[in-house]
Regions:
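Loop/turn positions that initiate beta-strands
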Residues: 1, 163-169, 245-249, 480, ...
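Extracytoplasmic
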Residues: 2, 163, 180-181, 216, ...
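Solvent-exposed, polar/charged alpha-helical surfaces in well-ordered, non-transmembrane soluble domains
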Residues: 3, 242, 307, 344, ...
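Boundary regions of SH3-family modules and the immediately adjacent low-complexity/disordered segments
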Residues: 4-151, 185-226, 266-298
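Intrinsically disordered, low-complexity acidic Ser/Thr-rich regulatory segments
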Residues: 100-174, 400-432
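SH3/SH3-like (including bacterial SH3b) beta-barrel domains
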Residues: 149-164, 232-248
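Cell wall/extracellular polymer interaction/catalysis modules
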Residues: 254-359, 363-408
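Exported/periplasmic cell-wall-interacting domains
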Residues: 293-295, 328, 335-341, 357-504
């Protein structure tokens, strides 16, 4: 039997239910919170863990988890220091449109991430929640709805690998006799020991609304240790002046000069102050206006060289932010980890979906041609490290980005990601990546809760946005996702997708 669903389409009763009192429906009532940049609570797996289907006994835990006693002893000693979080995406005050309010604060009755206890950081609504009804008595009253099928008697359904990003909807203390252990509830209703999860609040970074008081061109300062310069008249020389903080926004005059082989931009407020181009992400209009601009339509402008995204309504810029595109920046997307250039239209939108560590997803409409499997990123990192070390031995001049990568190599870190490799490396899963908008097979705009290096290319080809920006862009683009829906494929009934222009 088929039911018509609002506002368009049909659903078959073989695939859904209208009985809202079913245990599974009641157990899964906590849905994605569309009012927040991160629609779920998130964390990262610090040690391989079973994904339990019911509350395990202590004996079952010992059989299922390697060196459990040693792990729990270590956790009890370090719990307070390792489970702390910084303020994140959901802690930034937003207006009704989802734009960050400069200097704004949430009402005092709303808890910030650094005020929450561990249960709340893992998705619980209250500090000390009871055991969910569907897990009472050591049983499970609902079916296993994960993609990993197991017999009904199974204690757990698959293990979750270290570094996996988890989306969470709850947490509670499970009790087995005198043994007490906290469990987090994943979106697919499997249980993961809280001692093996590091909660995370995502990046609080965000872009800005553009208007008469914030005209373009301007730039974000990307580099730590950035300085302003004075250009010496009649000499091929630029002398350093003052320190300029990272991620500060600097108005530009539109004038550039070359000194000693480096490009400098003149600041808009002080004509004698110049900044190095390599320290900046510049927001400027395109050299020529594309078709949607001339038609007065909404469109998205992405510069791979500058790592910036600008939303336009016709020829009027309305919002700008930093992004992270494919890590090889301007390479061939068929053979490198680069974002394709060209004109595209959004083809699907999803509130959240799982991705693997190469940003492939079941909702992507196809894989990228550069997808290489779990070992591809590791081999690429090794090749990059070898190239940089050889260049240093040969005395070759390195770009600022390569200098950063070489410093990471010498510290024993991944050249591209540095210490953030712990949250975004090899063959693992990133669950419920938020605010996904596909513009080509395997390529999407989406939120990234696993890093905070926006302005630096580091993805496998997708366009990474900070969660606040990702949500705002998702809500701004067409067509809108109908109320109560989790995603749409763009078609004639939904309206045309917003145009995305990706250029050098």
């Amino acid at each position: 039997e088929w039911y018509r669903v609002y506002p368009t389409g049909y659903a078959c009763t073989d695939e859904f239910t209208t009985d809202i009192e079913l245990p599974l429906v009641r157990a899964s009532q906590k849905r994605a919170d569309l009012s927040r940049p991160l629609p779920y609570r998130y964390g990262f797996v610090r040690a391989t863990a079973p994904q339990y289907l019911r509350i395990p006994t202590r004996a079952e835990q010992e059989r299922s988890e390697f060196q459990l006693k040693e792990h729990l002893d270590w956790y009890r000693e370090h719990e307070h220091e390792i489970q702390q979080v910084a303020l994140g995406a959901n802690d930034v005050a937003l207006d009704r449109r989802g734009i960050a309010i400069p200097g704004g604060k949430w009402p005092t009755d709303r808890k910030l991430s650094n005020q929450m206890n561990l249960n709340e950081l893992l998705g619980a609504e209250i500090p000390d929640p009871p055991i969910p009804f569907w897990l009472e008595g050591g049983k499970r009253l609902i079916p296993n709805v994960s993609a990993f099928g197991v017999p009904d008697y199974a204690v757990f359904a698959d293990r979750v690998r270290r570094k996996t990003g988890l989306s969470l909807v709850g947490a509670f203390d499970g009790i087995d006799g005198e043994s007490r252990r906290k469990f987090a509830i994943a979106v697919d209703l499997r249980l993961i020991p809280a001692s093996k999860i590091k909660p995370d609040a995502g990046s609080p970074f965000h872009g800005i609304e553009l208007n008469e008081s914030v005209p373009i061109p301007f730039a974000w300062v990307l580099s730590d240790g950035c300085k302003s310069y004075r250009l010496i008249k009649g000499k091929d020389e630029a002398r350093p002046r003052d320190d300029v903080p990272r991620r500060v926004i600097v108005p530009l005059s539109g004038t550039a000069r070359i000194k000693a082989g480096q490009r400098y931009y003149q600041t808009g407020k002080e004509p004698t102050q110049w900044l190095r181009a390599e320290d900046l992400a510049v927001v400027a209009p395109p050299e020529s206006w594309p078709e949607p601009a001339n038609k007065g339509e909404k469109w998205i402008d992405i510069s791979l060289r500058q790592q910036v995204l600008v939303l336009y309504e016709g020829k009027k810029p309305v919002y700008a932010t930093l992004v992270s595109t494919g890590r090889d920046r301007l390479g061939d997307p068929k053979t490198t980890l680069s974002t394709p250039q060209g004109s595209f239209r959004l083809r699907s939108k999803h509130v959240a979906a799982a991705m693997d560590s190469e940003e492939n997803s079941a909702v992507s409409g196809g894989s990228r041609s550069n997808s290489s499997g779990a070992n591809g990123s590791e081999e690429s990192s090794k090749a990059t490290a070898a190239r940089l070390l050889e260049a240093e031995r040969d005395g070759k001049k390195l770009s600022t980005e390569d200098q950063r990568r070489l410093l990471n190599v010498k510290k024993g870190r991944d050249p591209e990601y540095g210490v953030t490799r712990r949250r975004g490396s090899l063959g693992f899963e990133l669950r419920d990546v938020p605010w996904i908008q596909y513009f080509a097979s395997g390529y999407a705009l989406h939120g990234a809760y696993w890093h905070d290096v926006f302005g630096v290319p580091r993805s496998h080809g997708c366009v990474n946005l900070a969660p606040i920006d990702a949500r705002y862009v998702f809500m701004w683009t067409d067509p809108p996702v109908p109320e109560g829906w989790h995603g749409i494929n763009v078609g004639s009934e939904m309206g045309e997708g917003t145009q995305v222009i990706i250029r050098e």
